[in-house]
């Protein structure tokens, strides 16, 4: 009984994500990646002239300001970009 309980505890610890890790979409290949420590935002960058076609996606620490040519959209939930 103790062995079974210990096994369940170990499996639970291994399966749980003890520290929150953000997952953001990448552009190429279309997949997600786990963000490193300190990068707590997902971002999507696209040209203002073609707002439906993202140019870059990934993890970032601070959302950059958009300009006349480039727009950034940032968010803080898994795969939100």
Swiss-Prot record:
It comes from the Eukaryota. GO terms for cellular component: extracellular region; membrane; other organism cell membrane. Residues 1-21 form the signal peptide. Expressed by the venom gland. Gene3D superfamilies: CD59. The keyword Cytoplasm does not apply. Keywords: Cardiotoxin, Cytolysis, Disulfide bond, Membrane, Secreted, Signal, Target cell membrane, Target membrane, Toxin. Disulfide bonds join 24-42, 35-59, 63-74, 75-80. It is found in: Secreted; Target cell membrane. GO terms for biological process: killing of cells of another organism. GO terms for molecular function: toxin activity. Monomer in solution; Homodimer and oligomer in the presence of negatively charged lipids forming a pore with a size ranging between 20 and 30 Angstroms. Shows cytolytic activity on many different cells by forming pore in lipid membranes. In vivo, increases heart rate or kills the animal by cardiac arrest. In addition, it binds to heparin with high affinity, interacts with Kv channel-interacting protein 1 (KCNIP1) in a calcium-independent manner, and binds to integrin alpha-V/beta-3 (ITGAV/ITGB3) with moderate affinity. Belongs to the three-finger toxin family. Short-chain subfamily. Type IA cytotoxin sub-subfamily. This is Cytotoxin 8. It comes from Naja atra (Chinese cobra).
């Amino acid at each position: 009984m103790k062995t079974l309980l210990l096994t369940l505890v170990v499996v639970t610890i291994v399966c749980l994500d003890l520290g929150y890790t953000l997952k953001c979409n990448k552009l190429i290949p279309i997949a997600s990646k786990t963000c490193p420590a300190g990068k707590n935002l997902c971002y999507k960058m696209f040209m203002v002239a073609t707002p439906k076609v993202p140019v870059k996606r990934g993890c970032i620490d601070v959302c950059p300001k958009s300009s006349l040519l480039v727009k950034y959209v940032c968010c803080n939930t898994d795969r939100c970009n």
